């Protein structure tokens, strides 16, 4: 999941973790 708003298990949203 890149540049998405999916939430990883027990993690913060990818949008915040990995901003494209």
Swiss-Prot record:
* Annotated keywords: Collagen degradation, Hydrolase, Protease, Serine protease
Q: What is its EC number?
A: 3.4.21.32
What GO biological process terms are annotated to this protein in UniProt?
collagen catabolic process; proteolysis
Which stretches make up the Peptidase S1 domain?
Answer: 1-20
Any one Gene Ontology molecular-function term assigned to this protein's record: serine-type peptidase activity
Q: Where is the signal peptide?
A: none
Name the coiled-coil region(s): none
Q: Where is this region: Disordered?
A: 1-20
Instruction: Say yes or no: keyword Protease present.
Output: yes
Protein origin, superkingdom: Eukaryota
| Reaction equations catalysed | Hydrolysis of proteins, with broad specificity for peptide bonds. Native collagen is cleaved about 75% of the length of the molecule from the N-terminus. Low activity on small molecule substrates of both trypsin and chymotrypsin
The keyword Repeat appears for this protein: no
Q: What class of enzyme is it?
A: hydrolase
Family membership noted in the UniProt record: Belongs to the peptidase S1 family.
What function is annotated for this protein? This enzyme is a serine protease capable of degrading the native triple helix of collagen.
Provide the protein name: Collagenolytic protease 36 kDa B
């Amino acid at each position: 999941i890149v540049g998405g708003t999916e939430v990883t298990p027990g993690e913060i949203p990818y949008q915040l973790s990995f901003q494209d």
